[in-house]
Amino acid sequence: MAKAPARSTRKRAKRQVADGMAHIHASFNNTIVTITDRSGNALAWATSGGSGFRGSRKSTPFAAQVAAERAGVAAQEYGLKNLEVFVKGPGPGRESAIRALNATGYKITNITDVTPIPHNGCRPPKKRRV
């Protein structure tokens, strides 16, 4: 059986993006940080669960901070400088994720809350009785 000729594989150069957007989805159970370019194509993402936190530790502000740092470091190879931040959800990791992105070295130009608010849509879950 003949072997296929070996192709030379070179790592493709990452495209350079100056401005980007950071989408922070902070739920009660997890925090998802996605960094995209201006048109919404994902460059890097990280979650609290994927950062090594399991169970109730996923929903802590520190887990959100670690996830935001990981996403920020992964997106730095695209040459990002400025970030516009969109925050969605009521979770505990909202503020700490923004602070972590700021500490990673990005210039945050705008922070927008895009939490979906129903105009009396679905019935909310029943109240907990402990």
Swiss-Prot record:
| Lineage top rank: taxon | Bacteria
**Disulphide bridges, residue numbers:** none
User: Keyword set for this entry?
Assistant: Ribonucleoprotein, Ribosomal protein, RNA-binding, rRNA-binding
Q: Which residues cross the membrane?
A: none
Pfam families membership: Ribosomal_S11
| PROSITE patterns linked | RIBOSOMAL_S11
An annotated GO cellular component = ribonucleoprotein complex
Q: Which GO terms describe its biological process?
A: translation
Q: Where is the signal peptide?
A: none
Does the keyword RNA-binding belong to this entry?
Answer: yes
Q: Which InterPro entries match?
A: Ribosomal_uS11, Ribosomal_uS11_bac-type, Ribosomal_uS11_CS, Ribosomal_uS11_sf
GO molecular function terms here? rRNA binding; structural constituent of ribosome
Write down the NCBIfam families for this protein, in alphabetical order.
PRK05309.1, uS11_bact
Q: What family does this belong to?
A: Belongs to the universal ribosomal protein uS11 family.
Q: What does this protein do?
A: Located on the platform of the 30S subunit, it bridges several disparate RNA helices of the 16S rRNA. Forms part of the Shine-Dalgarno cleft in the 70S ribosome.
- Self-association and partners: Part of the 30S ribosomal subunit. Interacts with proteins S7 and S18. Binds to IF-3.
Protein name, per record? Small ribosomal subunit protein uS11
Recorded source organism is Alteromonas mediterranea (strain DSM 17117 / CIP 110805 / LMG 28347 / Deep ecotype)
Highest classification ranks of the organism: Bacteria, Pseudomonadati, Pseudomonadota, Gammaproteobacteria, Alteromonadales
